[in-house]
């Protein structure tokens, strides 16, 4: 069932709720809706259980879409919470460029003794910064450097 046909062409929903950003898989009509939050709001959920995050997400969607929470629950098939703030390996993990980022990126993109290579969204210099696409492009660059050094 298409829950909100009038929103099918929506890519992003930006709200003034605790979880302020939502995006779809547009143009794919998969029914997947991703909520995203960062900064001080994310720190509020550092120790939250996935169920607690879901409760807040449903409240935010209820407020933004003007759909009763019970109806949202009825139509929810599954959910997953990625709590990067609580992950000891990422401790937050969203990157954005600041003054000096270009020089730092150049240094970090240089292999150490042709044996240690770095990759990730922060090392990508294109237009998709801070995304999975950026991390993937950076990884491809590192793989190409490795292949170049081993052939």
Residue spans of the language-model regions?
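Conserved flavin/dinucleotide-binding core of flavoenzymes
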Residues: 2-151
């Amino acid at each position: 069932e298409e829950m909100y046909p009038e929103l099918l062409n929506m890519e992003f929903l930006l709200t003034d709720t605790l979880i302020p950003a939502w995006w779809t898989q547009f143009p794919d009509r998969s029914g997947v809706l991703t909520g995203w939050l960062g900064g001080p709001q994310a720190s509020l959920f550092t120790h939250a259980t996935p169920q607690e995050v879901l409760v807040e997400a449903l409240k935010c969607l209820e407020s933004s879409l003007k759909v009763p929470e019970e109806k949202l629950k009825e139509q929810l098939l599954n959910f997953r919470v990625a709590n990067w703030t609580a992950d000891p390996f990422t401790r937050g993990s969203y990157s954005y460029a600041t003054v000096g980022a270009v020089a730092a990126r150049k240094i970090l993109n240089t292999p150490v003794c042709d044996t240690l290579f770095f990759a990730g969204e922060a090392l990508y210099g294109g237009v998709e910064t801070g995304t999975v696409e950026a991390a993937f492009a950076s990884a491809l660059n590192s793989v190409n450097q490795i292949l170049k050094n081993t052939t």
